[in-house]
UniProtKB/Swiss-Prot annotation:
It is found in: Cell membrane. PANTHER family: ZINC TRANSPORTER ZUPT, ZINC/IRON TRANSPORTER. It catalyses: Zn(2+)(in) = Zn(2+)(out). One of its GO terms (molecular function) is metal ion binding. The chain crosses the membrane at residues 6-26, 37-57, 73-93, 126-146, 153-173, 189-209, 211-231, 248-268. This is Zinc transporter ZupT. Its main location: membrane. Zn(2+) binds at E139, H164, E168. Mediates zinc uptake. May also transport other divalent cations. It is a multi-pass membrane protein.
Amino acid sequence: MDWSNIIFAFSLTLFAGLATGVGGVIAVARKAPGERFLAGSLGFSVGVMLFVSFVEILPKAVEELTGVWGERGGNWAATGAFFAGIALIAVIDRLVPTAINPHEPSTVGGAVEGYERRSRMMRAGVLTAIAISIHNFPEGFATFVAGLTDPRIAIPVAVAIAIHNIPEGIAVAVPIREATGSRGKALKWATLSGLAEPAGAVVGFILLMPFLGPEAMGLSFAAVAGIMVFISLDELLPTAISSGRHHTAIYGLVGGMAVMAVSLLLFI
């Protein structure tokens, strides 16, 4: 077991998780990013995550599993694990009430704007933080596994997840600041919601450690690819397009794919 790889993977996960704190800083400074920038950045994240999932992570899972179970068995196992990852994150997504679900951006704002009392604003912020923490847990596992796999994959994935964590931090910090008048409390809750990602990495590592081998790694890679694809299509792309900058989001998506492709080609 190479502890330097484990530390590297965990550091990337911590970096991605703490990006919610960046969102908190933006919220308390009352300087929100423009719609064009947000659409392009989220679209870029979608491009990176989709491309790396289908071109690098899923094929690597097939390679690991076919080495154990043969071509037919390995391909079936990788496909099953891929859709199991999608099912896992979809179930988590459905368990979170719509009004506080960070994957339902159109309802979050309306719910928060409808609260007239500070106590309800505080409750909205805390519940949003809890909801985001639930969603960030498997994302942390995904980033961690990518870090164990290959830095070429891990760094762009961590950056992509960090980008989409920034608006989540804003969603937590805004109602808490309005409720308490405290920038410190708003920033604290925004940052804490992102710490679920390194927690996901730790739990994933503890669960995987006794089973580290081609089977466990191959199944994990495929499941992580499924998780990343679902997050991209269910959360990031709709959020980017909902800004009203449809073409900017798509240009960002293509740009993310192109950057990811070039970064992989440079290391062949």
